[in-house]
Amino acid sequence: MGFWLSLCGAVVLVAYLLGSFPTGYIAVKQLKGIDIREVGSGSTGATNVLRTLGKGPGAFVLGLDCLKGVLAIALVYYLFTFASNQNLIPTTVNIELWQPWLVTLAGIAAILGHSKSIFLGFTGGKSVATSLGILLAMNWQVGLATFGVFAVVVAISRIVSLSSIMGAIAVSIVMVFLQQPLPYILFGIAGGLYVILRHRSNIERLLAGTEPKIGQKLVTETEQSA
């Protein structure tokens, strides 16, 4: 059992490291020579990359951040397949019970990695794209439904942060509606709340009516008072 627990712990650690890979930071550093944490919202996510570099790099970072979430969950599935074939899973382990919980832990680790990257002094993005990748890997129907909510809101409002918040709220509702395992539902609640908390400054701007729409530049307090 000790070896099995070590394998599970290693998978969660790798999931965190995958989430920590600073795609947005590297893209902006390589293409513009600046630290993305010092411009716009200070986030390393795709939206801030979009404002800083444009649509192409923004879409590229969005895809890679989403892929990080997919890979984190795929790693868990691979572990169970490999360990089962090699008879590494203890007979006392109920796979149907363990796998959803380990998927959930790996998902949480990837989200924390993206927003608290060990490679960036525990700073990062808001974990929206990485969360989407996790949801798609957990259950593609949940992922698509959540993305659908995001897409509808962004099409109407043209505000990415509002769309992300509404998607975060929708996750747990969709999980319950589609009768997902309890660990997934708990992930939807905890992950959704975490994403919303990461948008605190956006919520303040939304309430003040100063949150930029797609294509608009974020005006900082310094620029407003200049």
From Swiss-Prot:
It is an enzyme of class 2 (transferase). It is found in: Cell inner membrane. Its EC number is 2.3.1.275. Pfam families: G3P_acyltransf (PF02660). Pathway: Lipid metabolism; phospholipid metabolism. It catalyses: an acyl phosphate + sn-glycerol 3-phosphate = a 1-acyl-sn-glycero-3-phosphate + phosphate. HAMAP family: PlsY (MF_01043). Probably interacts with PlsX. PANTHER family: GLYCEROL-3-PHOSPHATE ACYLTRANSFERASE-RELATED, INNER MEMBRANE PROTEIN YGIH. Catalyzes the transfer of an acyl group from acyl-phosphate (acyl-PO(4)) to glycerol-3-phosphate (G3P) to form lysophosphatidic acid (LPA). This enzyme utilizes acyl-phosphate as fatty acyl donor, but not acyl-CoA or acyl-ACP. This is Glycerol-3-phosphate acyltransferase. The gene is plsY.
